[in-house]
Amino acid sequence: MQKTHVSPSRWLLSPKMTAEAEVLLFSFHYAGGHAGIYREWQKKLPVQIGVCPVQLPGRSNRFMEPYYTDLSVMIRELAEALLPHLNRPFAFFGHSMGALVSFELARYLRNQYGIKPRHMFASGRHAPHLPDPGEAIHHLPDAEFLKGLRTLNGTPKELFENEENEEILQMLLPMLRADFTICEQYQYQEEEPLGCGLTAIGGWQDPDITVAHMEAWRKHTSASFQMHMLQGDHFFLHSEQEQLLAIIESTLQSYLVGYRGIG
């Protein structure tokens, strides 16, 4: 769909950019998700970590805006919107589709502007150079697409649990199809690894994303790499939130101390 100019503020849902925030954590949601899933993080992480939930169009407060089906266009316009906020240390967290978006955004920022995040957290998605573990469904007719969504593990189960959600699901169908198009049509291009630290996080009970899928992220950084596997399925970022936030906080602490030392 054709894109129009959007105010940079529309891309961020109540970002926590206070004076105390020494590092901004831009957080990217999964397919079919929205920035609101990260609001609780703002209360649970220390004030030195400014959680900035990124809101893609076609959902929540941007429901009436056209959604993306081309990742390269999304990345270019997302970079332009976030650039004014990248004047202090920042990090990326992305879950599932969000991990892919944040990875390509980090590469774009490096190539076009010579800037990089201090750290990147890739959660619940196989490394980008690996083939998609599932069969593509974005091109299927609505009924088959919905059937595919029910069998795949990448969409919140709550959408399918009762008939009351059926009307909502029909409304969300174009956005869901667009998100899956982004993921399933992605073509990895070989480049130099990122120069920032990278943490890969997966769920032990995720039927599609294995330890090997997460370990393969190591290829994409020339800096430090660590991997964590948490209990839970694909949506462990909700069920294991406390443990996940502990990993994020402990990882970013070293950057906070360093930044304070500069001042």
From Swiss-Prot:
Top-level taxon: Bacteria
Entry keyword annotation includes Transmembrane helix: no
InterPro entries per record: AB_hydrolase_fold, TEII, Thioesterase
EC assignment: 1.1.-.-
GO biological process: antibiotic biosynthetic process; lipid biosynthetic process
Transmembrane segments: none
UniProt entry keywords in alphabetical sequence: Antibiotic biosynthesis, NADP, Oxidoreductase
UniProt GO MF annotations: oxidoreductase activity
Active site: 96
Other noteworthy facts: The reduction is strictly NADPH-dependent.
Annotated family: Belongs to the thioesterase family.
Function: In the final step of gramicidin biosynthesis, reduces the pentadecapeptide-aldehyde intermediate, that is released from the terminal module of the non-ribosomal peptide synthetase LgrD, to the final product ethanolamine-containing gramicidin.
Protein name: Linear gramicidin dehydrogenase LgrE
Organism: Brevibacillus parabrevis
